[in-house]
């Protein structure tokens, strides 16, 4: 029998390219399982195989515990120390028992356990092999095409055969069709250690694919002379990528385009002809958005840092180009910059600002007990809300011509009183529908919008997580994109426990 064990270890180790120690451990586990099946009671068994001779010994063991709940597998510390005073809780007491003989049932049980353990070892090796390659481009051969995904064989160093990866349908480009035997490239974006199912996940549609292709085609990126700051994609159609240089002598956009467009064309070809805009990064968010809106010319831009939005004005003749087909250009620019962008004509922006200024003047005259001329001065100085007047540093108000400290103090006091009155009126009108603390504390949601949600019965994070974008579509000041972000943030906290 000992020779058979050594032969099995050698054969499986060679066939699966697994370490011999892993096979010995699998065999020991298999023999222990087979031994347990010989007993009517549930016992704990350990098998030890001699790595040189193949002989094995079998031991029944009891775990030392403070209080016994399973007499067939546990023993008290007091009883264990009758045999050995050095033992402690958590140690084992062992007695050697007769080893199993390999009849048909024992062999079948051992085989099942060995197969399972070998499979677990193989999956562990896949994780170890590819963990360091996560985020990099890999090349694979299409093994099987399914309706929802395709299976790839990826070359794996140090393993018998190839590892299997999966590209889900959403990770492929639109209209992209593959057949068994095709060689394709993609970014390995997930390596999962789960005991069942796919372990390696590859994508061709995520922005990381675009970034890694440029890293291959543009040596300056690998040398860290040029840095990729952000990327946004409408897979298979259009993309934008933001780059900056760490060497002022090098033009990052020109380097990424390449001689006669060779570098960007190579990336575009790999992505099915995807049009790629290379955008110059700027630390100034407004200037960066102007760059990202290319090829459209921006006439003016207004930044609202509190709401993290920008109003972009273009000439009427450029409006269609600025928005892009189905909103593609402005959507990609928004994703690239991380700002919510509102594109409109110069006339529309002027009309909007006039309406906002008129509304602010009305609020100031109504709640601050000042005349229209004074209210107009405040608006022209950049103040548009009661909150700004109530809490802005006093020195900013004192910079306005004609205002002294007593006037500023009185103005701030009136603004605070007005805010308190409005808050009380708002809460009274809501009745029981008031936003809970968890909703008020949600990042990206201001107090005003929280009360608007509460007025619709969305009072808690759970309520928000249960909403769809269409449910919130008619709330003033809430775009579909912003609604989607808030809903997903609530779901991440409520459903997935993400407190970040």
Swiss-Prot record:
It is found in: Cytoplasm. Its main location: cytoplasm. Pfam families: HHH_5, KH_5, NusA_N. Sequence repeats lie at residues 369-419, 444-494. Coiled coil: none annotated. GO terms for cellular component: cytosol. Keywords: Cytoplasm, Repeat, RNA-binding, Transcription, Transcription antitermination, Transcription regulation, Transcription termination. Residues 369-494 are annotated as: 2 X 51 AA approximate repeats. Residues 307-373 form the KH domain. Disulfide bonds: none annotated. One of its GO terms (biological process) is DNA-templated transcription termination. Residues 135-205 form the S1 motif domain. It comes from the Bacteria. CDD domains: KH-II_NusA_rpt1, KH-II_NusA_rpt2, S1_NusA. The keyword DNA-binding does not apply. The keyword Transcription regulation applies. GO terms for molecular function: DNA-binding transcription factor activity; nucleotide binding; RNA binding. NCBIfam families: NusA, nusA_Cterm_rpt. Monomer. Binds directly to the core enzyme of the DNA-dependent RNA polymerase and to nascent RNA. Participates in both transcription termination and antitermination. Belongs to the NusA family. This is Transcription termination/antitermination protein NusA. It comes from Salmonella typhimurium (strain LT2 / SGSC1412 / ATCC 700720). The gene is nusA.
């Amino acid at each position: 029998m000992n020779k058979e064990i050594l032969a099995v270890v050698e054969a499986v180790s060679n066939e699966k390219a697994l370490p011999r120690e892993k096979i010995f451990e699998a065999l020991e586990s298999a023999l222990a399982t087979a031994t347990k099946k010989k007993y009517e009671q549930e016992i704990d068994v350990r098998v030890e195989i001699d790595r040189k001779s193949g002989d094995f010994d079998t031991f029944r063991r009891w775990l030392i515990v403070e209080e016994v709940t399973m007499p067939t597998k546990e023993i008290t510390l007091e009883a264990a120390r009758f045999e050995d005073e050095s033992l402690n809780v958590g140690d084992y007491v062992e007695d050697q028992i007769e080893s199993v003989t390999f009849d048909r049932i024992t062999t079948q049980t051992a085989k099942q356990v060995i197969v399972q353990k070998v499979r677990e070892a193989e999956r562990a090796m896949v994780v170890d092999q590819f963990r360091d390659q996560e985020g990099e481009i890999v090349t694979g051969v299409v093994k099987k095409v399914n309706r929802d995904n395709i299976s790839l064989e990826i070359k794996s160093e140090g393993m018998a055969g190839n590892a299997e990866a999966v590209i889900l349908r959403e990770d492929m480009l639109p209209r992209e069709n593959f057949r068994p035997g095709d060689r394709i490239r993609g970014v390995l974006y997930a390596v999962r250690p789960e005991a069942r199912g796919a372990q390696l996940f590859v994508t061709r549609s995520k922005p990381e694919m675009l970034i890694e292709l440029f890293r291959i085609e543009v040596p300056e990126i690998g040398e860290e002379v040029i840095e990729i700051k952000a990327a946004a994609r409408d897979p298979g159609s259009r993309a934008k990528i933001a780059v900056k240089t760490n060497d002022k002598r090098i033009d990052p956009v020109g380097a990424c385009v390449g001689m006669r467009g060779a570098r960007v064309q190579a990336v575009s070809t790999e992505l099915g002809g995807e049009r790629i805009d290379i955008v110059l990064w700027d630390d100034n968010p407004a200037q960066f958005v102007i760059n990202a809106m290319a090829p459209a010319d921006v006439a003016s831009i207004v930044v609202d840092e509190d709401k993290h939005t920008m109003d972009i004005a273009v000439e009427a003749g450029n409006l269609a180009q600025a928005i892009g087909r189905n909103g593609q250009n402005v959507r990609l620019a928004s994703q690239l910059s991380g700002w919510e962008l509102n594109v409109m004509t110069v006339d529309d922006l002027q009309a909007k600002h006039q309406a906002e200024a008129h509304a602010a003047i009305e609020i100031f005259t109504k709640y601050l007990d000042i005349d229209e001329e004074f209210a107009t001065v405040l608006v022209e100085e950049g103040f548009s809300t009661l909150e700004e007047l109530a809490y802005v540093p006093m020195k900013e108000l004192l910079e306005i011509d004609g205002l002294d400290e007593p006037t500023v103090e009185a103005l701030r006091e009136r603004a605070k009183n007005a805010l308190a009155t409005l808050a009380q009126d708002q809460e009274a009108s809501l009745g029981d529908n008031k936003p809970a603390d968890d909703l008020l504390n949600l990042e990206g949601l201001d107090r005003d919008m929280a009360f608007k949600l509460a007025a619709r019965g969305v009072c808690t994070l759970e309520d928000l997580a249960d909403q769809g974008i269409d449910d919130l579509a008619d709330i003033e000041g809430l775009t579909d994109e912003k609604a989607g972000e808030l809903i997903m943030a609530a779901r991440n906290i409520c459903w997935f426990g993400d407190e970040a």
